[in-house]
Amino acid sequence: MAKNIGLNVAVPEKDCDDVNCPFHGSLPVRGQVITGKVVSERMQGTVVVERNFLHKVQKYDRYEKRSSKIHAHMAPCLNAKIGDEVKIAECRPLNKTTSYVVVEVIKE
């Protein structure tokens, strides 16, 4: 039985026994909710999500494209592949570089 995590996301159909799963484990989510594209899934249980945004250059009063890469934990009940659009939510630090968890696969 999946629990309500407080976000407007679809609950995954598969069950998992991961303690760091926001739906089936005991990991609370809070803070930022970001959408981005998966660019790497080579780490075990972790994906790299690239987020694109616009940054204003004050001198020229114009915008430039920038991007940042965020490491996010992916539970076994969610199956995201490279190129998928995912929604990630902030959580407590899980390791040195991971403070986000994948909560929904938007577009495959």
UniProtKB/Swiss-Prot annotation:
GO terms for cellular component: cytosolic small ribosomal subunit. Pfam families: Ribosomal_S17 (PF00366). The keyword Cell cycle does not apply. One of its GO terms (molecular function) is rRNA binding. Keywords: Ribonucleoprotein, Ribosomal protein, RNA-binding, rRNA-binding. One of its GO terms (biological process) is translation. SUPFAM superfamilies: Nucleic acid-binding proteins. InterPro entries: NA-bd_OB-fold (IPR012340), Ribosomal_uS17 (IPR000266), Ribosomal_uS17_arc/euk (IPR028333), Ribosomal_uS17_archaeal (IPR019978). Belongs to the universal ribosomal protein uS17 family. One of the primary rRNA binding proteins, it binds specifically to the 5'-end of 16S ribosomal RNA. Part of the 30S ribosomal subunit. This is Small ribosomal subunit protein uS17. It comes from Methanocorpusculum labreanum (strain ATCC 43576 / DSM 4855 / Z).
